[in-house]
């Protein structure tokens, strides 16, 4: 689905060198287009020592998130490596994450919350994290919380309202 969204703008991106498509579980019959590279094929015979470590500073860019586009075209926002320190501290202070916790964040990793508080904050605080693939599902979420004995659960107010509407039958 995401590959289809970028097709119309590829010709306008002068600095684009390659497109690597990840299709681990083969959800799509033919996800590759034109000169796309297949991630699984590229990684098939690669060993860990094949990769060269690149030194970066705290001021180098680490990740780009796109805004939702609710006020115009989505914009790419660059985050620096230094932001990891703030995400670690926020995870510790606001979410009270600590070693030994089992953490479940329902935010999509494609959004800033899913990356910052779904992945980076728990990693840097040394907690076990659960990443769920899929949209809202009251029964699946409750099952995850019970099965994995989740200590800290992070979700959006909208999701809480949806859970409340689901009723007690799914609990």
Predicted regions and their residues:
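Conserved AMP-binding/adenylation subdomain of ANL enzymes
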Residues: 85-105, 109-152, 165-166
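Conserved pre-ATP/AMP-binding loop-to-beta segment of ANL
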Residues: 20-21, 35-36, 40, 44-66, ...
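Short beta-strand->loop structural element characteristic of the AMP-binding/adenylate-forming
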Residues: 1-8, 75-78, 105, 128-135
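Short hydrophobic/charged patches on amphipathic alpha-helices used for structural packing
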Residues: 7, 53, 138-142
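Alpha-helix/helix-capping structural signal
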Residues: 82, 158-161
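Conserved phosphate-binding and hydrolysis motifs of nucleotide-dependent enzymes
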Residues: 68-72, 76, 81
